[in-house]
């Protein structure tokens, strides 16, 4: 079996220090040799503009390399590829950049110029654009990019079906790149890029089945080769379970990930639409089964971690990340809709009101950087869930409109992240709200996938406008070390804040011995909930929680299994089950009983969380409650005219709809559900 590469978490401590994750910036030095891109500015009637993606796309003629070939390589030696990164020039144009250190003498990069992760997803963009618009240029680009993708796939030998990740500017493959990513060599085991290859091949086969039967037959052979690779390297453990801190987790996911496996499922679902194969269907259903096992339980989903989400990584119960989180979309398309519904209509309202599609809830809001890959994953999942469960269409439209507005200013930076005049999507928003104005392949691709989705869903597109965040009140975490420590409680600064499966907030945690206490001040909450974020370990004590001279209950830090297959001892997680805070409580005190407790933070859930968007003469508000019964509140929504108030339950079913002329709108937010107000 493979080792899982977690690029985000390998650098997360450094990333939070400098405000930039590896996902936001090219790991490169030196200058590229390509011609700079010139600025364009055509007037557009649709959102999706492929100009920048076209500029990133180049054709190369690779040398003969053992085990690698593609469709009609002798007749058409040039294949499609895609530059990995793009950095801005002083004049506003962009230049191509590869991955790793550039060597001008050999015109090579430590990793390469082009990579399978991006080429596969670029093929999906071209395929969807062609299918949606009939654009023959996109058909031709999809054809060439799929030929490039299948060239990267190893066609013979013990690694057949797997995929080499990196290619140099002259078409030479680089199976062992610097810096190293696992698996190494990159075609030696199942990987993210194998999963994304299946995604591209599945959608490619569906698109070309009638258009070019010969090419479709080739794609069918190659997707079956990839399916065989998953079957022998991943599903050889089907039915087995890992022991993650005392709870089972599926052992049969690509790279141990719900995220990676989801992208394979997307391709396999498309493949099945063309007839597929019995084996491919089995692989799809087994991967979907594993993803579904990472779903949050339905009980108390709205008030306990992870708030209804499908987790992305089988080896951790403590984290969620925005990038690649297409698990709900995959489950919906594979016919396993219940977890997708919970993720879309319980988790998404919590996520959007508490900050948006961050790169890392670990479990606190540690990595606040945001990228298009995260926003797009939420958008695609909402739309796919609505197709699988038509009764949720209105709820999905409302939430997707809010998610889509991320690209047009409804984000922590308050700026457009996508420019329809050029087709560029910026590479991300740093944790401090500054923007990384690079525009590489991944950001471009997922920006365009979102724009294609909006072009194909006019009802959602009408809700996506120039926006700024007028108000946001949601889940926050108060670090334990900022509190008043008594009874021998002491701050501990671990050597690394990253544990291997989660991440401490602030400077570390507080070691609270039996009888010791921590008192932390609370933000405004109006009678919300607190969830102590505790490093649970067998034999640890419990925390008795009080506020305003009232006992809210206790949480057991020792109620956890042994480490088992988890990457780190202990389980850093928010613990729920406490009574609601008194409305006037300005602080909360946590006292250890029966043993020491490692307290990282206190997660505070307001009685009513809200996100309010100012949309150029209009306004939208999203509200959710942490209480166990319906909650009355008011919200001031920008804009003129009547406001429409719609309420939904946690399964996305509409409960009520009404209109009002009031400037300040009264709303009854349903328990475990949410409400939207649109003016």
Predicted regions and their residues:
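Secretory targeting and sorting signals
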Residues: 1-34
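Carbohydrate-binding surface patches
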Residues: 613-638
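A short beta-strand element within beta-rich, extracytoplasmic domains
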Residues: 522-539
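Low-complexity, Ser/Thr/Pro/Gly-enriched N-terminal "stalk/linker" regions
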Residues: 35-121, 132-186, 214, 218-247, ...
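Well-ordered alpha-helical scaffold segments within catalytic/enzyme domains
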Residues: 120-136, 196-215, 263-279, 325-337, ...
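C-terminal beta-strand-rich structural cap/linker in extracellular carbohydrate-active enzymes
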Residues: 662-679
């Amino acid at each position: 079996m493979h080792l899982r590469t977690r690029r985000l978490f390998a650098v997360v401590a450094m990333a939070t220090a400098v405000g930039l994750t590896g996902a936001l910036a090219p790991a490169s030095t030196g200058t590229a040799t390509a011609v700079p891109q010139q600025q364009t500015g055509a007037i557009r009637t649709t959102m999706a503009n492929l100009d920048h993606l076209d500029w990133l796309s180049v054709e190369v003629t690779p040398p003969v390399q053992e085990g690698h070939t593609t469709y009609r390589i002798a007749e058409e030696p040039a294949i499609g590829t895609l530059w990995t990164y793009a950095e801005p020039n002083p004049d506003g144009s962009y230049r191509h950049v590869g991955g790793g250190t550039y060597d001008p003498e050999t015109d090579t990069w430590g990793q390469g110029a082009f990579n399978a992760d991006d080429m596969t997803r670029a093929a999906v963009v071209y395929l969807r654009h062609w299918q949606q618009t009939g654009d023959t240029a996109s058909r031709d680009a999809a054809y060439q990019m799929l030929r490039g993708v299948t060239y990267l796939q190893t066609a013979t030998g013990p690694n057949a079906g797997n995929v080499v990740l990196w290619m140099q500017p002259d078409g030479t493959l680089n199976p062992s790149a610097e810096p190293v990513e696992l698996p190494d060599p990159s075609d030696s085991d199942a990987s993210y890029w194998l999963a994304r290859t299946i995604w591209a091949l599945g959608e490619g086969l569906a698109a070309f089945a009638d258009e070019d039967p010969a090419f479709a037959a080739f794609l069918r052979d190659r997707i079956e080769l990839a399916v065989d690779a998953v079957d022998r390297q991943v599903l050889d453990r089907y039915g087995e379970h890992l022991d993650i801190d005392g709870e089972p987790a599926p052992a049969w996911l690509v790279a141990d990930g719900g995220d990676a496996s989801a992208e394979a499922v997307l391709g396999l679902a498309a493949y099945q639409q063309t007839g597929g194969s019995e084996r491919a269907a089995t692989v799809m259903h087994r991967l979907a089964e594993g993803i579904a096992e990472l779903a949050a339980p339905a009980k108390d989903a709205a008030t306990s971690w992870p708030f209804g989400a499908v987790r992305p990584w089988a080896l951790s119960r403590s984290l969620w990340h925005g990038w690649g989180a297409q698990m709900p979309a995959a489950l919906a398309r594979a016919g396993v809709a219940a977890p997708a519904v919970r993720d879309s209509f319980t988790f998404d309202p919590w996520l959007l009101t508490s900050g948006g599609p961050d790169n890392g809830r670990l479990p606190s809001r540690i990595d606040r950087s945001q990228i298009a890959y995260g926003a797009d994953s939420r958008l695609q999942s909402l739309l796919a869930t609505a197709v699988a469960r038509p009764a949720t269409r209105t709820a999905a439209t409302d939430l997707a409109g809010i998610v889509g507005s991320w690209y047009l200013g409804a984000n922590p930076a308050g700026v457009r992240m996508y420019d329809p005049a050029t087709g560029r999507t910026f590479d991300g928003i740093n944790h401090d709200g500054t923007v990384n104005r690079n525009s590489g392949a991944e950001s471009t691709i997922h920006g365009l996938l979102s724009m294609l989705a909006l072009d194909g869903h006019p009802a959602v597109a009408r809700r996506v406008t120039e926006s700024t965040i007028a108000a946001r009140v949601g889940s926050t975490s108060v670090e334990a070390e900022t509190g008043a420590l008594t009874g021998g409680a002491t701050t501990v600064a671990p050597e690394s804040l990253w544990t291997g499966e989660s991440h401490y907030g602030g400077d570390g945690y507080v070691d609270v011995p039996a009888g010791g206490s921590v008192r932390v001040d609370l933000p405004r909450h109006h009678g919300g909930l607190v969830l102590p974020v505790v490093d649970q370990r067998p034999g640890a004590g419990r925390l008795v929680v009080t506020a305003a001279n009232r006992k809210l209950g206790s949480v057991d830090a020792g109620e956890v299994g042994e480490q088992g297959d988890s990457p780190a001892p202990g389980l850093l997680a928010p613990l729920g089950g406490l009574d609601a805070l008194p409305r006037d409580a300005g602080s909360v005190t946590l006292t250890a009983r029966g043993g020491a407790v490692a307290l990282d933070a206190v997660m505070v859930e307001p009685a009513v969380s809200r996100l309010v968007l100012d949309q150029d003469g209009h306004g939208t508000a999203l509200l959710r409650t942490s209480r166990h019964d319906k909650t009355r509140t008011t919200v001031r929504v920008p804009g003129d005219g009547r406001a429409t108030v719609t309420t939904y339950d946690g399964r996305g079913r509409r409960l009520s709809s009404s209109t009002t002329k009031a400037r300040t709108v009264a709303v009854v937010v349903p328990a475990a559900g949410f409400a939207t107000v649109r003016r």
